[in-house]
């Protein structure tokens, strides 16, 4: 999502979408013009990107996150889900025994208020409004009518990690997530506060 959205299409290749969150950098009206390296844009051949995922290019990444300093990281190319996990998808994880199959939770260290918990004790805290394992806002182990395609909310990091393992994936590490979701230009000159005022969020 951003102010400028470009789509590149070529027969035999996956469509590539480019987003510019803050076009002031591109249109040269920023008070301190930044310098960018001009490089070719590589597209992925058809059949090389898993369904409902997108390919993120590797290379240098300077996250500039608060408290992290300005560190230069080199990331390898990777895939990330194109859409959020829906209530319906998470319900299938539950129905398939997600909270009962230990391999999805293996090697996790469950901590609450500074104390370690067993997997069994931790699961007792991962419950919905009726005490059944599931997202916090659900009732009797299911989402509300009409909300099957909404993004799932009210789950812990542990549950998200277990779901990712169930799908044969992992949760993206911090810097991989930042590179995919948060343009560096938004850090340098954020435009989100302006857009938020004009958004239709209640």
Where are these predicted regions, by residue range?
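Short, low-complexity, polar/charged sequence segments that are solvent-exposed and flexible
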Residues: 27, 72-75, 174, 190-191
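Functional-site microenvironments in short loops/helix caps that host divalent-cation chemistry
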Residues: 56, 121-124, 132-202
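Short secondary-structure transition/capping segments
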Residues: 28-30, 114, 183-187
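A short glycine-rich, aromatic-capped structural motif
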Residues: 2-25, 33-125, 129-130, 135, ...
């Amino acid at each position: 999502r951003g102010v400028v959205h470009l789509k590149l299409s070529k027969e035999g290749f996956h469509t590539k979408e480019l987003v510019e969150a803050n076009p002031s950098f591109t249109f040269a009206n920023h008070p301190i013009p930044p310098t960018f390296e001009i490089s070719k844009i590589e597209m992925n051949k058809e059949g090389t990107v898993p369904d409902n995922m997108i390919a993120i290019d590797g290379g240098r990444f300077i996250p500039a996150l608060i408290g992290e300093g300005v560190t230069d990281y080199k990331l390898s190319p990777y895939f990330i889900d194109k859409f959020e996990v829906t209530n319906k998808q998470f319900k299938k994880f539950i129905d398939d025994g997600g909270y009962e199959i230990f391999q999805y939770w293996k090697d996790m260290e469950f901590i609450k208020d500074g104390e370690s918990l067993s997997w069994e004790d931790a699961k007792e805290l991962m419950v919905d409004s009726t005490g059944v394992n599931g997202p916090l806002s659900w009732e009797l182990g299911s989402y509300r009518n009409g909300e099957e395609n909404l993004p799932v909310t009210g789950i812990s990091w542990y549950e998200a990690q277990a779901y990712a393992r169930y799908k044969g994936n992992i949760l993206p590490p911090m810097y991989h997530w930042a590179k995919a979701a948060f343009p560096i230009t938004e850090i340098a000159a954020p435009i989100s506060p302006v857009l938020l005022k004009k958004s239709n969020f209640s």
